[in-house]
Amino acid sequence: MNSNDILIANTDDLRSDMDYLEKTLLKGHRIDPNLYEEYDVKRGLRDSTGRGVLTGLTEVSDVCGFDVINGRKIPAEGGLYYQGINVNDLINGLKGKRFGFEETTFLLLFGLLPKKDELAHFLKVLSELEDLSGRFVRDVVMKASSSNIMNALQRCVLTLYTYDENPEDISVENALRQALELIAKLPLIAVYSYHAYRHFRKDETLLIRNPEKGRSLAENILYMLRPDGQYTELEAKVLDVALILHAEHGGGNNSTFTTHVVTSSGTDTYSAIAASIGSLKGPRHGGANLKAQGMFCLLYTSPSPRDP
């Protein structure tokens, strides 16, 4: 038997041992499903009827997808509200070449739509906070590139802790500063992580472009993402609306609930947001977008829409 045979044999032994441990684990942790109903235990954030479980109160946003009449869910025209304002009204209120994500961010954070001078000041703050140091891009974003951008975001957010001179301070003032920095920096981290993935995993040309002052967040994402930096006004508008619609979905969704749980321990902002990103990544939450994209790709490549 040569060294390769020994390696294969050891690998087979390990696989057999792991199979045994897995079966033992599954046998040792089983709870009668009927006990959940008997003790009225909620398995997740919905009860047995599909209704959301009340875990807290919020005025930030609300989602309405159905009415409950006599204990039955009746489909209704969906509605999404930010600080009591219908999102449709927010989007319809955008005129000309205005972009609305930054205004929506201000609304969600501070509870009211910004005046012209307030918006200008807010945009200036975000612009000043968006820069990533070359050292961070080189040592964090480019190292150990991930095939999943959500995983890359989670890792980068955790590492931002070490670049913060006051990471443990959870006062309102400092937490707001950290939140604004994350809002400003995450688009860059997402785009750069994607380029790192394409370069190191797909052998594509590496492209890193700095954001350009004066562009909206949606415009800068496309500007940094595209090799030639070009995009149409329609593309930027569609992305801006998508960002608005994804900005917040009520205080009871999985990732927001994760934030409540993790921050209740008094931990730092970066740990809380990283945990929430991990929750958002799941296929039953934000990761469902990838599943939907996969369905479209399947329809596109199938000879017939009816083919599996």
Question: PLM features: what roles do these ranges have?
Answer:
Residues F296-L298:
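Helix-rich, well-folded core regions that mediate interactions or catalysis
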Residues N2-L25, V172-L176:
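Beta-strand-enriched accessory nucleic-acid recognition/scaffold domains that flank the catalytic cores
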Residues F106-P114, G266-G294:
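Conserved phosphate/anionic-ligand binding catalytic regions in large, soluble enzymes, centered on
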Residues Y300-P308:
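Single conserved hydrophobic/aromatic residue that forms the stacking wall/gate
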Residues Q83-E102, L239-D240, G252-S279:
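Short, hydrophobic/aliphatic alpha-helical segments
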Residues S16, L21-K23, K27-F136:
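An N-terminal structural lobe/cap that precedes and organizes the functional/catalytic core
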Residues D62-P75, K124, A236-N253, H260:
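An acidic intrinsically disordered interaction segment
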Residues V140-G250:
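Glycine-rich, mobile lid/loop segments that gate access to catalytic sites or pores
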